[in-house]
Structures are given as C-alpha cells and as structure tokens.
Amino acid sequence: MSWTVPLVRASQRVSSVGANFLCLKMALCPRQAARIPLKGAWRFTSVSKMATVKSELIERFTSEEPVHHSKVSIIGTGSVGMACAISILLKGLIDELALVDLDEGKLKGETMDLQHGSSFTKMPNIVCSKDYFVTANSNLVIITAGARQEKGETRLNLVQRNVALFKLMISNIVQHSPHCKLIIVSNPVDILSYVAWKLSAFPKNRVIGSGCNLDTARFRFLIGQKLGIHSESCHGWILGEHGDSSVPVWSGVNIAGVPLKDLNSDIGTDKDPEQWKNVHEEVIATAYEIIKMKGYTSWAIGLSVADLTESILKNLRRTHPVSTIIKGLYGIDEEVFLSIPCILGENGITHLIKIKLTPEEEDRLKKSAKTLWEIQKELKI
C-alpha cells in the first residue's frame, strides 16, 4: 500500500498585530498527522493552495519604491492613550500607528479592536508590541503612560516615580526614533516635559508638552456657552501651568476682534458684577468633576492631542498654547516648561508668540514658574 504524503504548514496567531509565525512545517503521514493536537488557535493550511491563490489573483506590475511615510507611536494604551489613537486615526493623518504598553493583554486587545475598524479609518497599518522596536522611525511619539498618584503620596514622590519610568521610555524612544518629535501628555505634564527634554537631549523645539491646549479649549467653550456663540469664534488663552495655577489672559479675550475688557473693565476680577472669573474656576474644576463622575478624562484630551498632531504632521504653523521652555521670558529665570502660544509645524515648535500680559497676569505666570521649580530642583534625573 502506498501513501500520498501531504505537505502542511501549522501556524498560530500569536500577536494582535496579525502576524502569523510558522511553528511546524513538515511532511507527515496520516497516522502522524492524526496525533497532532488541533485545539486552540492552531490552523493547518495547504501551502501550495495559498501560493496558487495568490499567484492566480495577483501579478507584480512594477517594483515598489519607498515613499514618504508618516508614523506616530503612542506609549500607553490607557483611556487617554486610546482616545489619542482613535482621534488621530479619524483625522486620517498617518500611514502607520504603533502602540506600546507593558500590559500585553490590554495592548493586544486594544490593537485588535482598532484593526477590526481599519476599513472605516482607511488606515490598516496598526502595530503593537511591548518592545520599543515597533516605534522605529516614528515622526512623532506621544507619551501618555505614567505612574498614578497613590493615597497620601506627595507630588514630589509621584514625579520622582515618573522620572524612573521616563528614563526607560525616553532611552528606548531615542534609540529607535532619534529624529522624532515628542508630545508629553502624562501628568504633571509641565514637569514631565522638562524631564523628557533633559533625558532625551533633544533640541527644545522637539519636546512639546500638551500643556494648556485643552485648558484653552475649555475656556473658549465656557465663554461661548455664556455668550451663546460657538467656541471657535471665542478667542482667549489659558497660559502657564496645566492645572490649578493656570493663568487666564482676560486682557486678550475677544469676539470678532472686540475685546471683552473694553465692554467690562473689571472682567475676570473680584469686582466684576458678572463674575466672569467663575469661567476660569470652572476650567480648573471641570476635570475633577469629570473624574468624579466617570473615573478619568479621555475624549477631550485625545482630541486636543490629535489637534497638535495635525499641526505638526501637516506643517500647518498654527498657534497653540503648549508647554515649552520659558526661561528668559516674562522675567522668569527658572528653567521650567510652561504653556505660552507657540507656532507648531513639521519641526515642532518653530516660534513663540510674545503675547502681551498685564502686570497681574505676568505675576501669576512667575508664581506658576516658581511653584514648578520648587519641585524640579529636587528631582534626581
């Protein structure tokens, strides 16, 4: 009796990025093949049939030359990281998205979930790994990962724990994408932007903190709500630290070029009968309110980061209030990162806008700088 010996290949999907790794490839007799366990994700396919289908379906027409490739990597697949990912994908800004996280199960699950929607985003090249090699040759790397504050922990201790994490992340990013731009989203964002700048040794234009871009969006939204006008038509800035000591620039708030301060000279002060200062107080309080209700903030910061990403990758040269080194401006002598209006393009921050501040606004900015410096000077980087 003679046997026909088929050639088979066993492959198992072991990665959420869709890579199939050959685990078995041999000629088997029927008795041997019957003893191979077929449980789990193992799959046997005729090699010759796959090759035939492909060769019958597709014929090479020309050799493919490398083209301009736009790649963004996101470090951290928590609620903020994934909000950044989907916001960027829906804008159609990139050719490749890479995700990195230490939680391999969540990382693969989130990646598969995005991949399965790639028909709707028109961007199928979504990859992931615990290893930073997957981020190689990124144009832009967005860091959302970081340690969370524990009960009773001081801000300095929290920052120091994040410094340890950043040492690992930044060294890997620099190794694989030495020419990338960095957007830091992890909190406290201003201090960690400074840490990333120091650890990476990148030029200052290539390290950008998400800073007050979201604070400013909230500010404009709330002004619009009060006036019954769309937020895009409300012009105003929140500068300084992202957080409780941020500075509302009431002197520059205007609608269609009409300064609100010309209509209400006390706007934003305690003397203001309309209590416009409550708008800024709500900007600060709203994040805490959202966290209290849903446990975290995600969508607005994700959209904010996608907005910054668009300005950089498309070289739009739009102005954003992002965190950058501010030493030498507004009488600030400390080497700190704070938000001021910056022009963003393909090289990162190309110019700073020297926005005119009142003496009171400038004093608040200086106070913000000193608050950050008191923490930064104690850091062990």
Curated annotation (Swiss-Prot):
Binding site for NAD(+): D101, L102, D103, E104, G105, K106, R148, N187
InterPro entries (UniProt xref): L-lactate/malate_DH, L-lactate_DH, L-lactate_DH_AS, Lactate/malate_DH_C, Lactate/malate_DH_N, Lactate_DH/Glyco_Ohase_4_C, NAD(P)-bd_dom_sf
GO cellular component terms given for this protein: cytoplasm
Alphabetic keyword roster: NAD, Oxidoreductase
Pathway in which the depicted protein is active: Fermentation; pyruvate fermentation to lactate; (S)-lactate from pyruvate: step 1/1
SUPFAM superfamilies, A to Z: LDH C-terminal domain-like (SSF56327), NAD(P)-binding Rossmann-fold domains (SSF51735)
One example of a Gene Ontology biological process annotation: lactate metabolic process
Domain of life of the source: Eukaryota
EC code: 1.1.1.27
Catalytic activity from the UniProt record: (S)-lactate + NAD(+) = pyruvate + NADH + H(+)
PANTHER family to which the protein is assigned, alphabetical: L-2-HYDROXYCARBOXYLATE DEHYDROGENASE (NAD(P)(+)) (PTHR43128), L-LACTATE DEHYDROGENASE A-LIKE 6B (PTHR43128:SF8)
Family: Belongs to the LDH/MDH superfamily. LDH family.
Protein name: L-lactate dehydrogenase A-like 6B
Organism: Macaca fascicularis (Crab-eating macaque)
Lineage: Eukaryota, Metazoa, Chordata, Craniata, Vertebrata
